[in-house]
């Protein structure tokens, strides 16, 4: 969740607890009687996990602003060279969508000038949208739950928000939107 922008707990702390078979219990300082969130090996949390998986689909929403969307149209060879240059310069990409005719990805705006310089060196068409935000829904078995993207699209459409790009994993679904549409 932290890597998606949530202000929760450092991933290294989770890793240390996992390696030592320790259950972390995250409490709410404003409501100490609330049970909070337990993080630990699935075998140790089996009962709690099974109960919550039946009742809760989404468990958190995280967000990050200052994201840029980059779309590139060019040959596979050019794009491979671009990726190599980005790797050499330690520029991370996120929300990667590679289609036959175009490639799209998101990145932190702090890397935008450097990426644009790389793109200008190659014979590719590109489009950059700098004022974006990533909203991530974190939940249980996201990719195994039918209709998730349809529900998200209905919610976005109801608020006249354009979905610029999306990506998913087993436990999360991220939506790239205009930064002005993200309300924190």
Predicted feature descriptions by range:
Residues 1-168, 172-184:
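C-terminal catalytic "cap/lid" subdomain
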């Amino acid at each position: 969740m932290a890597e998606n922008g949530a202000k929760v707990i450092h991933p290294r702390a989770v890793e240390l607890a996992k390696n030592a078979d320790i259950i972390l219990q995250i409490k709410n300082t404003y409501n100490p009687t609330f049970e909070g969130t337990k993080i630990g090996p699935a075998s140790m949390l089996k009962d709690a996990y099974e109960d919550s998986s039946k009742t809760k689909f989404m468990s958190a929403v995280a967000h990050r602003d200052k994201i840029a969307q980059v779309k590139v149209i060019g040959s596979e060879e050019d794009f491979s060279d671009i990726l190599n240059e980005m790797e050499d310069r330690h520029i991370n990409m996120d929300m990667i969508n590679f289609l036959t005719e175009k490639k799209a990805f998101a990145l932190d705006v702090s890397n935008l000038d450097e990426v644009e310089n790389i793109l200008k060196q190659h014979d590719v068409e590109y489009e950059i949208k700098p004022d974006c935000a990533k909203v991530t829904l974190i939940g249980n078995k996201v990719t195994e739950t039918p209709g998730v993207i349809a529900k998200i699209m209905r919610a976005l459409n109801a608020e006249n928000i354009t979905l610029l790009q999306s990506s998913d994993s087993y436990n999360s679904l991220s939506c790239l939107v205009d930064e002005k549409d993200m309300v924190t």
